[in-house]
Curated annotation (Swiss-Prot):
InterPro entries: ATPase_NBD, Chaperone_DnaK, Heat_shock_70_CS, HSP70_C_sf, HSP70_peptide-bd_sf, Hsp_70_fam. Autophosphorylated; GrpE inhibits the autophosphorylation. It is a peripheral membrane protein. The keyword Zinc does not apply. Changing residue 468 to D: In dnaK756(TS); confers temperature sensitivity. It comes from Escherichia coli (strain K12). The modification N6-acetyllysine is found at residues 109, 245, 304, 421, 556. The modification Phosphothreonine is found at residue 199. The gene is dnaK. This is Chaperone protein DnaK. UMPylation of the chaperone by SelO/YdiU negatively regulates its activity, and may facilitate survival under stress conditions. The lineage of its organism: Bacteria, Pseudomonadati, Pseudomonadota, Gammaproteobacteria, Enterobacterales. Keywords: Acetylation, ATP-binding, Cell inner membrane, Cell membrane, Chaperone, Cytoplasm, DNA replication, Membrane, Nucleotide-binding, Phosphoprotein, Stress response.
Length: 638
């Protein structure tokens, strides 16, 4: 069995890890970094860039550089959170035919799973380069508070990237695995506070150890899937835009290039203010008007940043209270607090969390790498490489169906340990009703319309009977990935209908297959591009070395040969500017054929040089003998 890699598919950065024996190892990407920016760019010449190369060119290509795509995955275009992003993102977010939030790049409509798959492909390639073998299986992490549609969309992204997703696990749970694996024995209850680039989670986890086996049991989880570092950046960007407008009378929001530069500067300033008390946002030539170029130079203090984001930090505290309440615990029951996600490096976040729990968070867990390490550990558990570890996760939101009067009737309550299965018997609302519609919902509100609709299906063929007589058994079955399977059965006729809940929109099988094929075609195109570059390099080398040999041959090369070679060199030079590998190879072949006389001359010159060199060495050796004899050491007799 091959390795199952662990991938933290983050909003801002992603990370990949593997199990090296019984030790998890975070892998460095081709650029030598342990984390990869979750940024994808589509260049003018049709190339797809992922990670640092995409980030570097963002300033000059803002409309075609996609970031924070995880905030759109599994979401509807009309969602309030998506509408907030539509107004601030430099790229175009559109409504797909099925109502999902998609992105349009260079006239092409793309689904978020398709874009996230590019990041997963980079993670896959990083692992393959390290292991020296193909990788086909992965454990991918998601925010604990992701709903069913978002989990499905993440699995779809894995498939499009050519990965079989063996398990979807929650990010805080993965961080707890990374933390608990190498800590000493004994039972403890931990709180994992995970504030990443785009999402926030809190999980209360109990680690029990019995006879050397560790059980990680999630007691409760809560969060906000649209709260993270990107929101902190936005607050600072808005402040800088307003200050510049006051000072210069120009609104930078109308200038995508300026906004992209500002985004990078704001992110950098935010990071600097975690260790410094103040910083300068200095952007020369940020824009221009009729009077000439304009420069931005604004001082930002840590106190100013904190005042801008205080409500965001406070927003993360409410879920902590709910999670503790759901777990039936008080603050004093928590033994350790673990911070995960880059945004937790902000001193204000650390201070608020410490105040809430009454203890300092642990500093020995790497907030950027813990989640990927935990995913790799879970991969090791699935392959059998990691023993004595049992993971008991929960479903983050209640699941149920719509019943008479537009009420949601819960079948599986939030924070139920998964996998789990629950059945309940319902009946008809009308006399002689021959079909029922099962409308599946996820959420905590009593009114069905206020919850997330996961889909619906019909159960037909119910025998005519007075209302309330037929017995319809509805079964909810949640698998270990937290994905829901629903069945409805008429106990009288034995008729049954089953579905795996796909997002009421989501990608259908044909769309996923097409995206998988496109990804494979891209891989083929990438391979051909690599071969073309290698051939070009060989052609360049041949061009350079032939010109040098023509120069060295001088008058020894007959004029006819020289003319033929010059003509072949020009033809090769032209071919090298094109995109046709076969044409370059053909011109290299032609050059080699007309250069035979040149090769002979070069070989003769080389042989003469070697002979001359050998003669010179022999003469030197004779001279050396004379010198040595002259300076022969004579020891005095004592």
């Amino acid at each position: 069995m091959g390795k199952i890699i662990g991938i933290d598919l983050g909003t801002t950065n992603s990370c990949v890890a593997i199990m090296d024996g019984t030790t998890p190892r975070v892998l460095e990407n081709a650029e030598g970094d342990r984390t990869t920016p979750s940024i994808i760019a589509y260049t003018q010449d049709g190339e797809t860039l992922v990670g640092q190369p995409a980030k570097r060119q963002a300033v000059t290509n803002p409309q075609n550089t996609l970031f924070a795509i995880k905030r759109l995955i599994g979401r509807r275009f009309q969602d309030e959170e998506v509408q907030r992003d539509v107004s601030i993102m430099p790229f175009k977010i559109i409504a797909a035919d099925n109502g999902d939030a998609w992105v349009e790049v260079k006239g092409q409509k793309m689904a978020p799973p398709q874009i996230s798959a590019e990041v997963l492909k980079k993670m896959k390639k990083t692992a393959e380069d390290y292991l020296g073998e193909p990788v086909t299986e992965a454990v991918i992490t998601v925010p604990a508070y992701f709903n069913d549609a978002q989990r499905q969309a993440t699995k779809d992204a894995g498939r499009i990237a050519g990965l079989e997703v063996k398990r979807i696990i929650n990010e805080p749970t993965a961080a707890a695995l990374a933390y608990g694996l190498d800590k000493g024995t004994g039972n403890r209850t931990i709180a994992v506070y995970d504030l990443g680039g785009g999402t926030f989670d809190i999980s209360i986890i109990e680690i029990d150890e019995v006879d050397g086996e560790k059980t990680f049991e999630v007691l409760a989880t809560n969060g906000d899937t649209h709260l993270g570092g990107e929101d902190f950046d936005s607050r600072l960007i808005n402040y800088l835009v307003e200050e510049f407008k006051k000072d210069q009378g120009i609104d930078l929001r109308n200038d995508p290039l300026a906004m992209q530069r500002l985004k990078e500067a704001a992110e950098k300033a935010k990071i600097e203010l975690s260790s410094a008390q103040q910083t300068d946002v200095n952007l020369p030539y940020i824009t221009a008007d009729a009077t000439g170029p304009k420069h931005m130079n604004i001082k930002v203090t840590r106190a100013k940043l904190e005042s801008l984001v205080e409500d965001l930090v406070n927003r993360s505290i409410e879920p902590l209270k709910v999670a503790l309440q759901d777990a039936g615990l008080s603050v004093s029951d928590i033994d350790d607090v673990i911070l995960v996600g880059g945004q937790t490096r902000m001193p204000m976040v650390q201070k608020k969390v410490a105040e809430f729990f009454g203890k300092e968070p642990r500093k020995d867990v790497n907030p950027d790498e813990a989640v990927a390490i935990g995913a790799a550990v879970q991969g090791g558990v699935l392959t059998g490489d990691v023993k004595d570890v049992l993971l008991l996760d929960v479903t983050p939101l209640s699941l149920g169906i719509e019943t008479m009067g537009g009420v949601m009737t819960t079948l599986i309550a939030k924070n139920t340990t998964i996998p789990t299965k629950h059945s309940q018997v319902f009946s008809t609302a009308e006399d002689n009703q021959s079909a029922v519609t099962i409308h599946v919902l996820q959420g905590e509100r009593k009114r069905a319309a206020d919850n997330k609709s996961l889909g619906q299906f019909n159960l037909d063929g119910i025998n005519p009977a007075p209302r309330g007589m037929p017995q319809i058994e509805v079964t909810f079955d949640i698998d270990a990935d937290g994905i829901l399977h629903v069945s409805a059965k008429d106990k009288n006729s034995g008729k049954e209908q089953k579905i795996t809940i796909k997002a009421s929109s989501g990608l259908n099988e044909d769309e996923i297959q097409k995206m998988v094929r496109d990804a494979e075609a891209n891989a083929e195109a990438d391979r051909k591009f690599e071969e073309l570059v290698q051939t070009r390099n060989q052609g360049d080398h041949l061009l350079h070395s032939t010109r040098k040999q023509v120069e060295e041959a001088g008058d020894k090369l007959p004029a006819d040969d020289k003319t033929a070679i010059e003509s072949a060199l020009t033809a090769l030079e032209t071919a090298l500017k094109g995109e046709d590998k076969a044409a370059i190879e053909a011109k290299m072949q032609e050059l080699a054929q007309v250069s035979q006389k040149l090769m002979e001359i070069a070989q003769q010159q080389h042989a003469q040089q070697q002979t001359a060199g050998a003669d010179a060495s022999a003469n030197n050796a004779k001279d050396d003998d004379v010198v040595d004899a002259e300076f022969e050491e004579v020891k005095d007799k004592k």
